[in-house]
Curated annotation (Swiss-Prot):
The gene is argH. This is Argininosuccinate lyase. Pathway: Amino-acid biosynthesis; L-arginine biosynthesis; L-arginine from L-ornithine and carbamoyl phosphate: step 3/3. Its EC number is 4.3.2.1. One of its GO terms (cellular component) is cytosol. It comes from the Bacteria.
Amino acid sequence: MTNTTQDKKLWGGRFAEATDGLVELFNASVAFDQRLAEQDIRGSLAHVAMLGQTGILTPDEVAQIEEGLQGILADIRAGRFDWRLDREDVHMNVEAALRDRIGPVAGKLHTARSRNDQVAVDFRLFTKEAALDLAAKVRALRAVLVAEAEKHLQDEVILPGYTHLQVAQPILLSHWLMAYAAMLERDEGRFRDAAERMDESPLGSSALAGTPWPIDRFATAAALGFARPTANSLDGVGSRDFALEFLSACAILAAHLSRLSEELILYSTFEFGFLTLPDSHTTGSSIMPQKKNPDVAELARGKAGRVFGNLMGLLTVVKGTPLAYNKDLQEDKEGVFDSYDTLSIVLRLYADMLPKTVWHADVTKLAAARGFSTATDLADFLARSGVPFREAHEVVGRLVGLASRTGRQLWDLTDEELRAAHPLLSAEVARALTVEESVKSRRSYGGTAPERVREQVAAAKAALS
């Protein structure tokens, strides 16, 4: 990227002094908004075609401008375009390059258009495409989770379910996997819903009030793949809620991926030992030869913070900006780019890592059996026998306390101890409350019983097909 001030600014007619060098550096956005170059040129091609269709430009003028824009696009794709800081942004870089290439007729491209609607349409195009791309990547990860759930259903692998990170009740590993698949289904829906709401073209709104030129906004909207033009020109150029909605969906997805990461990190530790992450997605230590660090999961967890920050940053930018365009809105893009890039790679990594993760069913089953995970089942046994549940809860709570104080499990208690707590209890009853039976008993809709989880998997596969 070069930095020269030899050219007159395309907006410089009103000014008698050159722009201060530090202001030029501070004002420029081309270092990051050049990423919108393809969208910018697509918008310009749609605009100039419409100017020709409506008779505002002659066929020859349209042809010259189109040929020039296509040449610039080829240079950009080949990496030989000279991005210049003194030309501020992607729009002025492209327009100035067009003028250098085809001469004064390039100035007619901006007829009936402002940089305000130009940047708005570029940014909407990018954000809509990013939302749909992330939706597709989320869908791919959903499919991986569902496939893993189906695989582990074959052996009905049991995992401890937790509340407060303490063993609560036994569940199927497949049930746990399907919980994350359900979260991602909603994430995918949020991106698709956001893309549908932002499917309106602001091109033709001009600076803020529309234009007296006889343009056809419906034609440019259709040419760019939008469903319709924005209904209000002021809203079209002055609103960034489409970017906020995208970042909100990104933040919620990042939170879900962070929760998954946290559990994978915990479960891969020596203390848990539930799973082994693949060597291909872990790293070692420069000093401790035994270490196998879950860097992918840790970075996915850590990067959630920057995605949250991108949402809060843009909310803070737009909350105090009066209609319509303000230079503050230059700050809307980097957070969107960053969140998209961050989540794109995390989703791809997880889709690759999860099928290679090895679960240790013997360890997870043993862990599920500890911590009095079938205590609720014992209380339910009493309740089914006619004991009020609150009374049953208290009885079993006392037994848990006794077993805990004496270093035993519920099934280790004697007949005498159990009958002393309640005459309906016995050692035979306690021993019958296995983690397998506990899991099988949870047959309510959405529960962890194998037949219920199979229903969840079947429904998810049907939704993905």
